[in-house]
Amino acid sequence: MEIKLEQLGYCYQKNSPFEKRALLDVNVSFDSGSYSAIIGHTGSGKSTLLQHLNALLMPTEGKITVGEREIVAGVKQKKLRDLRKKVGIVFQFPEAQLFEETVEKDICFGPMNFGVSEEDAKLRAKKVIYEVGLTEEILSRSPFELSGGQMRRVAIAGVLAMDPEVLVLDEPTAGLDPHGREEIMEMFYNLHKEKGLTTVLVTHSMEDAARYAEKIVLMKAGTVLQIGSPREIFAKPDALVDLGLSVPDVVRFQGLFERKFNVKLTKTCLTIAELITEMAPYLAKGGA
């Protein structure tokens, strides 16, 4: 499912003394089945943009098109439930939203709230619990008896049980250890490929943006500063650092190598394998 934002703008508490501009003239599209990342410093508008993707927030200017559904600023919208079924959002610390007495009931809550029968919802719960790396026996347990990592997977299963066509991820690995982060990100990537999901990741991790995204949207102060491939975005690491962002370790090491040997490699490397290949001629000569 394609998503397109055209001249999108948003103000909190518009036309009040407390009006605050959050987004201005945002133009970006997310192709059906693509994996995109949105990056930017805290306060750049990433999460505000994200909440427009399933109409949790409505634009104050411009429009957003999600599949066949068009949302135009100032036009009253009906039947937003249909849109919200198709666009699933995993927020930071989603386990904080768990509340039912069993894992199964928690996973079933969303689908049943959107009109899915209890029988069908239970079948979905059995399916998605495996998709998030857990087993069926956990369905009868209280979510509050589980580890933090298991609780997060259960919360994610609740989003997947809605059978979305678009998956929006807002810092989905916040608070996890490195191993847990990698497991969760690999899980999302596998789901993206297997289900053909349109995936949009909001992240502070440049490593994840470089590793998984096909396209990166760089934001600053509510505007889109640049749109490009990971290689294009990370080709100017100093500009990202000036914005208060980090760069992937491979990119940082490439910069150190180029300065040390006074050379310029033929491309911005995103993996260790690429970097080794690029450095090999200079290392063989003992430097340039």
UniProtKB/Swiss-Prot annotation:
EC class (word): translocase
Molecular function (Gene Ontology), one example: ATPase-coupled transmembrane transporter activity
A Pfam family of this chain: ABC_tran
InterPro entries named in the record: AAA+_ATPase, ABC_transporter-like_ATP-bd, ABC_transporter-like_CS, ABC_transpr_CbiO/EcfA_su, ECF_ABC_transporter_ATP-bd, EcfA2, P-loop_NTPase
Chain ranges of the ABC transporter domain: 3-246
Residue numbers binding ATP: G40, H41, T42, G43, S44, G45, K46, S47
Topology term for the membrane: Peripheral membrane protein
Domain of life of the organism encoding this protein: Bacteria
CDD domains registered for this protein in UniProt: ABC_cobalt_CbiO_domain1
Gene3D superfamilies (UniProt xref): P-loop containing nucleotide triphosphate hydrolases
Primary localization: membrane
Subcellular location: Cell membrane
Record's GO cellular component terms: ATP-binding cassette (ABC) transporter complex
UniProt entry tagged with the keyword RNA-binding: no
EC number from the UniProt entry: 7.-.-.-
Keywords: ATP-binding, Cell membrane, Membrane, Nucleotide-binding, Translocase, Transport
Nucleotide-binding as UniProt keyword: yes
Family stated for the protein in its record: Belongs to the ABC transporter superfamily. Energy-coupling factor EcfA family.
Binding partners and assembly: Forms a stable energy-coupling factor (ECF) transporter complex composed of 2 membrane-embedded substrate-binding proteins (S component), 2 ATP-binding proteins (A component) and 2 transmembrane proteins (T component).
Protein purpose: ATP-binding (A) component of a common energy-coupling factor (ECF) ABC-transporter complex. Unlike classic ABC transporters this ECF transporter provides the energy necessary to transport a number of different substrates.
Name of protein: Energy-coupling factor transporter ATP-binding protein EcfA2
Organism, scientific name: Listeria welshimeri serovar 6b (strain ATCC 35897 / DSM 20650 / CCUG 15529 / CIP 8149 / NCTC 11857 / SLCC 5334 / V8)
